[in-house]
Amino acid sequence: ILIIGEEIVPLSPFEKITLFAMKYSTFKTIMPFRSAKVTLFFLCTLISCKNNGQTQGNTSVQNTEKQTKEVVVGANRMYLYIKDLRAKNIAIVTNQTGIVKAEKGNYVHLVDTLLKKKVSISKVFAPEHGFRGEADAGEVVKDGKDTKTGLSIVSLYGKNKKPTAEQLKGVDLVLFDLQDVGVRFYTYISTLHYVMEACAEQHIPVIVLDRPNPNAHYIDGAVLQPAFKSFIGMHPVPVVYGMTIGEYAQMINGEKWLQAGVTADLKVIPLAYYTHQTSYSLPGKT
């Protein structure tokens, strides 16, 4: 065998070649040495090429990983939550921002994706602006039926902003997926509060699919005073609070802001390759 560094190479396969060269060479006295030199050089070259190939391969993989380390939203990390949805009646709180990146690179709605995966969705809870985002700011959102999926739409921006016990009847789990902007007076964090509160009261688990906060890199503005609490400001946080929707859900639980100090059975599906300094452009559905 030949040992070079960490490589161990058996020389037995080259024995016949060496003997053949020695037998038929005209340089009888020096051929064994020359043959051995050529063989050794050949083997060293092979080993060098092999090591170089491994190094280049590893570098290529690392570069590829770096290039593909784009932000992955919670909704796209289905392997972390799809098992929680099986054999259950699911209600989902979402709107037009609840999209996921498909294998072909295009974007499709989470509801369509889950239905395709045979997840039983019983209803959609619609926040301000409605399920399809067609209502104006402050416009009352009505209950109805989605024309594309046939699912029942239950408004959380109409006669009630908190799901009632009747609306949650028969629901085993609530999935929450809304893109927020990280500003206190946007109502999605208030909807999150009421959904968590209602589910805590009815002992229904909540899964929040985290999405980036485009304003997570800073905190700014005055903290809301309790005397001015309303649906456009429910919590004592700054105007720009610097948290993702998943982090905010954990804060609601941790600070015991829900009525009577209850806490929701909460699971947050985190983002991948994201920090509060990560730049992020909102995707568009194609």
List where the protein language model places each region.
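Glycine-rich, charge-decorated loop segments at or immediately adjacent to ligand/cofactor-binding or catalytic sites
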Residues: 132-137, 207-229
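Conserved anion/nucleotide-ligand pocket segment
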Residues: 229-286
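Glycine/threonine-rich flexible loop motifs
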Residues: 180-192
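A short helix->loop->beta-strand "cap" motif at the edges of active sites that frequently abuts
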Residues: 119, 201-205
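Short internal beta-strands
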Residues: 120-128
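Glycine-rich oxoanion-binding loops at beta->alpha junctions
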Residues: 141-170, 183
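N-terminal phosphate-binding or glycine-rich loops at protein starts, especially the Walker A/P-loop
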Residues: 70-119
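Bacterial Sec-dependent N-terminal signal peptides
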Residues: 1, 10-13, 17-67
